[in-house]
């Protein structure tokens, strides 16, 4: 028996993507990604991925050789704002943290996230 509800969900999502238009969606993701990259630079971080290999929907941030308390930052962000970002995984756990701007995120939602990141990071610099 196929998972009919999943097929309906997929159709709805594809319809919403097509209603926005692929080029518009790609441009929105690029704009949101540039907002995250500006935040990264503002706080003296660097992208983990080299230029040319960076995603437009997810930013992996280098942890400055382990000088930044990624686990503490993530915990404080969640406690204060109920926001969850990823602290990396496998070999890069703790030496990166990741911020997503994919899906249906908007300039407003990313700006809210940036404001929350700014609110918490002052305790970790």
Regions found by a protein language model. Give the residues of each.
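A common structural junction motif
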Residues: 77-85, 119-124
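Conserved PLP-binding catalytic core of the aspartate aminotransferase-like
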Residues: 46-80
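PLP-dependent aminotransferase class I/II
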Residues: 16-22, 35-51, 65-66
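PLP-dependent enzyme catalytic core of the Aspartate aminotransferase-like
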Residues: 91, 95-125
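Structural signature of PLP-dependent enzymes
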Residues: 1-34
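Predominant activation on well-ordered alpha-helical scaffold segments within soluble catalytic domains
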Residues: 5-15, 37, 71-74, 111-118
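Small/polar glycine-rich anion-binding or flexible loop at a beta-alpha turn
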Residues: 33, 52-59, 90-98
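A short linear hydrophobic-aromatic micro-motif
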Residues: 44-48, 83-88
């Amino acid at each position: 028996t196929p998972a009919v509800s999943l097929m309906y969900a997929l159709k709805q999502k594809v319809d919403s993507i097509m209603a926005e238009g692929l080029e518009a969606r790609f441009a929105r993701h690029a704009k949101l990604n540039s907002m995250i990259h500006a935040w990264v630079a503002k706080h003296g971080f660097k992208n983990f991925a080299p230029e040319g290999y960076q995603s437009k929907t997810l930013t992996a941030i280098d942890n400055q050789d382990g000088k930044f308390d990624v686990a503490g930052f993530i915990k404080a962000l969640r406690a204060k704002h109920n926001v969850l970002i990823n602290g990396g995984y496998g070999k890069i756990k703790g030496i990166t943290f990741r911020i997503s701007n994919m899906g249906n995120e908007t300039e407003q939602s990313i700006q809210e996230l940036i404001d929350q990141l700014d609110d918490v990071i002052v305790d970790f610099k």
